[in-house]
C-alpha cells in the first residue's frame, strides 16, 4: 500500500500512520466488542504481498491469543488485492464457506467498503459484523444502515504534517535519529 515503508536501506526516514501493533490490536478489539467476544471471524485483506497488511495481520493474530478472545476463532485470511469486485467476491466466499461466521476484519479501505456492501446485499446486517480501516466518505451508507458499526483510520492531516515536517528537517540536516517533538508539540518516536 501507499502507506507501506520502503526497504530500510533505501530511505533516510520513515513515518508510520500509527503503530502497527495498535492497528492490529484495535481492529480485533472493535470486532470483539461487536460480536460479544465469541464466534468465527475472518480477515479480508488487500494483497498477500503487502508488508503493512501482513504486519497488521500478524499483530491481529497475536492479539487473538489473549484470554479474552478465547471464544473467537480466526477461520480464514483471504485477499481481495485492493480490487473492489474481488474483495466483494471474497466476502461472499467467506459467507458460503463459513455459515456461522460472525465477523470480518478488513484492514483496507477498498476491502472494508466491499465487505460492508456484501453484508448489505446478502441481508447479513446484524449476523456478520464488519470492521477494519476505512474512509468515512466510502462507508457513510454502511454506517447508517449498521452494516459497519465501527472502523478506524489514522488522521491523514497529521500524517501529512509529520511527513512535511520530517522532510524539511531532513533537508536541513536537523534529524539526529533521537526521539523528539514535532512542530505541533506532539511526541514523535524518532526524529
Model-flagged regions — what are they?
Residues 23-27, 51-71, 86, 90, ...:
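Short, solvent-exposed amphipathic alpha-helices that sit
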Residues 12, 40-43, 64-84:
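Short beta-strand elements in bilobed, periplasmic/extracellular small-molecule ligand-binding domains
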Residues 107-116, 144, 154-176:
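Extracellular/periplasmic ligand-binding modules, especially the Venus flytrap/periplasmic-binding
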Residues 1-22, 33, 40, 136-144, ...:
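Flexible loop/hinge segments that line or gate small-molecule binding clefts
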Residues 48-52, 62-65, 162-191:
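Hinge/cleft segment of the Venus flytrap/periplasmic-binding protein
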Residues 60, 76-142:
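Hydrophobic alpha-helical
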Residues 1-3, 17, 40-45, 76-77, ...:
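Structural recognition of the beta-strand scaffold that forms the well-ordered cores
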Residues 31-39, 95, 163-175:
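Short, hydrophobic alpha-helical segments
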Amino acid at each position: 500500500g501507499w502507506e507501506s515503508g520502503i526497504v530500510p536501506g533505501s530511505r533516510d526516514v520513515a513515518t508510520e500512520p500509527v503503530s502497527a501493533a495498535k492497528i492490529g490490536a484495535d481492529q480485533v478489539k472493535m470486532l470483539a466488542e461487536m460480536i460479544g467476544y465469541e464466534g468465527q471471524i475472518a480477515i479480508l485483506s488487500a494483497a498477500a504481498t503487502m508488508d503493512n497488511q501482513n504486519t497488521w495481520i500478524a499483530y491481529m493474530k497475536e492479539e487473538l491469543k489473549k484470554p479474552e478472545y478465547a471464544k473467537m476463532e480466526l477461520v480464514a485470511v483471504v485477499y481481495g488485492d485492493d480490487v473492489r469486485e474481488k474483495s466483494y467476491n471474497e466476502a461472499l466466499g467467506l459467507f458460503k464457506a463459513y455459515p456461522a461466521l460472525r465477523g470480518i476484519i478488513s484492514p483496507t479501505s477498498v476491502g472494508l467498503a466491499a465487505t460492508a456492501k456484501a453484508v448489505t446485499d446478502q441481508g447479513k446486517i446484524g449476523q456478520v459484523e464488519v470492521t477494519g480501516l476505512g474512509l468515512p466518505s466510502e462507508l457513510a451508507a454502511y454506517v447508517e444502515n449498521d452494516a459497519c458499526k465501527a472502523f478506524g483510520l489514522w488522521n491523514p492531516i497529521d500524517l501529512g504534517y509529520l511527513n512535511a515536517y520530517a522532510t524539511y528537517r531532513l533537508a536541513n540536516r536537523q534529524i539526529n535519529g533521537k526521539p523528539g517533538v514535532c512542530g505541533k508539540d506532539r511526541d514523535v518516536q524518532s526524529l
